Regions:
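Class I SAM-dependent methyltransferase SAM/SAH-binding core
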Residues: 1-3, 7-52
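A short acidic, Gly/Pro-enriched loop at the edge of an enzyme's catalytic core
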Residues: 51-62
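A short SAM/SAH-binding and catalytic strip from SAM-dependent methyltransferases
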Residues: 62-74
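A short glycine-rich, Lys/Arg-flanked "PGG" loop and its adjoining helix->strand segment in the class I
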Residues: 76-88
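Short alpha-helix
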Residues: 121-136
């Protein structure tokens, strides 16, 4: 399952390694764009609300939510819903931009993200983001900070409360 899939870049890239992928986004426009060049019967795109997913408990081995938790309201509620649909031995892959403590140039980039319709609702440092995941019932199995225009913290997690 990929949440906040946007145009489907990640799902399309990894589809050959999976039996089936459900890729969702809250934006009908993004899903329409993702469907436009989907060539795999193993990949299904749909408009869904990550806070109220239509899937049964423990439906997925892997959930990916990339670059989204910092822009959604109440990311802890999204994590609760992810925990519900993820199998007990499943893996959450949740890279997100970690803007807190950035330089002036980082603040300027955040301003332009807001203008583009992606306001920062959670401004974490890398350490703060990993702490947030742990406080919400996740054990961080792997993490790394990737330096780019915005620093990105990659987090690979498993349920800490099963």
């Amino acid at each position: 399952l990929e949440l906040a899939a946007g145009t489907g870049l990640i799902a399309k890239h990894i589809v050959n390694a999976a039996a089936h992928i459900e890729a969702t986004d809250a934006s009908a426009e993004m899903i329409a764009e993702a469907k436009r060049d989907n060539r795999s019967a193993k990949l299904h795109f749909s408009v869904q609300d990550m806070f109220c997913l239509p899937y049964a408990n423990q439906s997925f081995h892997v959930v990916i939510v990339s670059n989204a938790l910092h822009i959604v309201p109440q990311p802890e509620k999204a994590l609760q819903e992810i925990k519900r649909v993820l199998k007990d031995d499943g893996v959450l892959i949740a890279p997100t931009f970690t803007h807190a403590g950035n330089s002036f140039s980082g603040m300027v980039k955040a301003f332009f993200m807001k203008l583009a319709g992606f306001p920062l609702r959670s401004k974490w440092t890398s350490e703060g983001y990993l702490r947030f995941l742990r406080q919400n019932g996740w054990a961080v199995r792997k993490s790394a900070v990737l330096k780019a225009s915005f620093p990105l913290t990659y987090a690979e997690c498993v349920k800490s409360e099963v």
